[in-house]
């Protein structure tokens, strides 16, 4: 099978001069996750509009009502959410910002590396280097910025990045580019006995660093793109090697779900941009229990961004398979936390 490089690295040169990392207020790395007691409120999804809001609530009520044909036991109430473009904004992708952060960090510590590839191409914004080098050059960059360190070191760097990073174009902390309606949905599902997972094309460790603080999802409930690991006995740690073990995108998402979760979800949410969530939604729909699929349509240029896939693959798949499409413009009363 032909290897594919995750899309979040393709635009790194475009954001090289946009990213600003500065120290923000002490709560910059935090966001307000709606409490899981939200389901006990009269309105568990206050940022959602009908009819989609009602359809979600009706589904949850159906599968959680004991004694009915559609009842799903708590152990089987698995919900999987994509991250980029589904739980937070993706223009630019946070993974791109982190890759730049790491390049800057590395060349500051060792200036001589700024004259060597792939760092030279990033520093000089040499787009042709990556276009000509293709997959090999991109994997080289990924390996150089995301591996060669212990898991503890990587997590420390990731948390420092999230504590200081400012999102380009909006001048807000990363915690402020999460989607408020989705925070409510996550809390509502958990309060209804669901276990919520993130299934992301992004690197698993980067998302694990903030999944709990941003979404109330513990790190052991994050599935994502992974590098190969090796155990180092001398310091009893796990080192990351510059080779991708699982690309958790498209057909890789069901594989990741099976590897980490071990069963099909009954609820899944993704978004349109690259067709990366189609297979996850299909996998979810094949569950023998009643299931529910959501695809976020980025059609609100005023409050977020407007972009579509060239072939509209995700939206076409949603229509064909009778999944639910979230119109950001029409279905969400608000988009970002206030």
Residue ranges and their predicted role:
Residues 1-9:
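Bacterial N-terminal signal peptides that target proteins for export
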Residues 17-20:
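C-terminal motif of bacterial Sec signal peptides marking the signal peptidase cleavage site
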Residues 25-47, 61, 76, 155-338:
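C-terminal cap/substrate-recognition subdomain and adjoining C-terminal extension
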Residues 40-82:
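Mature N-terminal segment immediately following signal peptide/propeptide cleavage
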Residues 66-73, 91, 110-116, 196-201, ...:
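Surface-exposed patches in mature extracellular/periplasmic domains of secreted proteins
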Residues 77-92, 281:
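Asp-based phosphoryl-transfer active-site loop
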Residues 93-94, 98-176, 180:
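A metal-dependent, Asp-based hydrolase signature
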